[in-house]
Each structure stands twice: as structure tokens, then as C-alpha cells.
Amino acid sequence: NHTQIDNIVIVASEMWQGYIMSWIGKDNLSKFSGFAPAGSSRQHSIVNGLIKAKSIGAVADDNIIIHDAARPNVSERIISQCMDRLSEYDGAMPVLPVKDTIYLSENGENITSLLNRDQLYAGQAPESFKYGKYLEIHNGMTEDDLSKVRGSSEIAYKHGLKICMIPGDECNYKITTKEDLNKFIREMEEH
């Protein structure tokens, strides 16, 4: 229901699309504009979503926002700030300062160096971009190239796009472990 979002494309494998449609019907998601097929990697899936966006009328100067189902607690503030920063930047992403001391080990057994925690940030989703610039950086990339991308902003940064960091939120955590899922379920039961 965010006012800065006009259309929603969901990237999902065909086997999940019926299930997702049942939830879209319950939530009356009027901005849903269709599915794009899942790719062989996260970034390949994103490219499929970008192609689908073009098929429904996305143009180069449109703003896009990329989010994943693993972070269901994204706030309206984060979405707004990601979108608002596109007036000055090619992209924006929420980040949190790293709290732990980070060590580098080249062999996995002993410390090679200590990284400066004051310069390290943990990236979150969603990430927003200027549609045309973000689509263009994928031209000529192979499936192997796409499989090596670990984050939407990684590829943008490596291709010279100017990416802004906005304050993230501890509540916008990624559900990747059983403990994360249990935490999310407890939070849903409390509300």
C-alpha cells in the first residue's frame, strides 16, 4: 500500500505461484502486475523481474525497489527513504553499523587482519535503483556472472553506480535460520 509503489512484480518459481495468488486474493493486492519466473540464481531472478517490469511499461527513468521474502518486516520508512534518495543517487540501500569485531582469515584457521568496524556496514533489503541504469549493467552478463553476485547493490557499485546508504532497522532482519523463523513466529503471535 505504499504510495511510491505503483506496480508489484513477484519473482517466484511456477510451483509457488498458485499459493502466492491465494494470499494476494486475501490481501486484495491491487498493485500486483504479474509473475516473473525464478532464475538459476538470486541475480538471475532479479533480471527476470526487470524484464517483466519492462513488459508492463517500466521506462528508464522509473524507480524500482527490489525486496525479498526473507525480510518480511520492512518498514514504510525504509521504503520511503530508499525511493526518496533516488533523486540524488543511482541506488539506495538500508544498512546497519557492524557491532561485532570483524576478522579476516585467508585460510580459515588464523587471523590475517582486523578490519575497522567503524567503516563496516551490514546491508539489508530492499534496495532501490533507477530502472534504466540498473537494467543496463546486466547487459552481456552470463548466468555464471549472475551466480557470483551476492547483493543487488554489489553489482551496481562494481559498475560505477552511486549507491546511498540509509539507516536500516534491527526489526528488518533476514529469516535464514530456524531460530530466525521462530523469532518471527513469536513476534507475529504477540501482535
Language-model features and meaning:
Residues 97-100, 170-171, 179:
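Glycine-rich beta-alpha junction loops
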Residues 58-71:
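Short beta-strand-to-loop acidic/aromatic patch adjacent to the donor-nucleotide binding site
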Residues 60, 73-166:
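Conserved core of the sugar-phosphate nucleotidyltransferase
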Residues 172-191:
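Hydrophobic helical membrane-anchoring modules
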Residues 9-10, 66, 91-94:
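Structural beta-sheet core signal
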Residues 20-21, 82, 184:
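Hydrophobic packing residues within well-ordered alpha-helices of enzyme cores
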Residues 1-61, 142-144:
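Conserved N-terminal catalytic core of the sugar/cofactor nucleotidyltransferase
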